[in-house]
UniProtKB/Swiss-Prot annotation:
Residues 20-129 form the KilA-N domain. Transmembrane segments: none annotated. One of its GO terms (molecular function) is DNA binding. Pfam families: KilA-N (PF04383). Coiled coil: none annotated. It comes from Acanthamoeba polyphaga mimivirus. This is Putative KilA-N domain-containing protein L33.
Amino acid sequence: MSKKISRSIDTIIFVDINSRYTKCQYCDIYIIIDNENGYINITSLCSIISKKIGKEKTFKQWKKNKTSKEQVEEMAKLEKISEKKLFIDICSGPKKMQGKYIHPGLVTLVVHWISPEFAAKVSLWIEEWRRYSSNNSDKYYESLLTANPSYNSQREKEIQEKLLGKYGGEIEVETKTGRIDLMTNDKIIEIKNYYKWKNAIGQLFAYSIYYPDKKKCLYLFNVGTNDLNEIKKVCKKYDVKLKVYD
């Protein structure tokens, strides 16, 4: 199928690649859009922006951040879909169409992380939207006044400080694979939401490479009435001490 320019806004050009994909281009910067769902090829976009700024910024790096993980959780809740459905991997077809496609709502968050300039522009666009109508203004201030702090980060910090007071040691100990929540004379401690227990065990094993003589300890919060049997089996098998902190 031959390419054709479908529409143009000032210097922004939209090109139909085929019936499914469209390329949106501004000068030498472009994005690939999946017309079926509006998802955008974030792999390609991050690569292009990284070359422009001379510093590698990848989607994988963004996704590893604690804040990013919580943003993904919140987006899934708002859209009423599973987290997995926010991402689509395209591994076949023309090379330029391959990569990780993500929900358009996440694209703004990723580029916000990459570019302070873009973040500032988004803030001003929101301000423009707020001023457009009293209804918009009401929605804005309602969201602003009811904004919830990061539960995971807040709770982790509370537990971290209590354990530091109890056991002593050092918090946020930096390693090549991440930061240890709390390290004492004989323990490396990871604090995690129940639903992220697998991540926590993986982190403990990564940290234990640097501190092989220290005991691996996992503190879980937000457990409630959830089943711990499988977690206990895994922890026992891999010599991880499990504690519940609810």
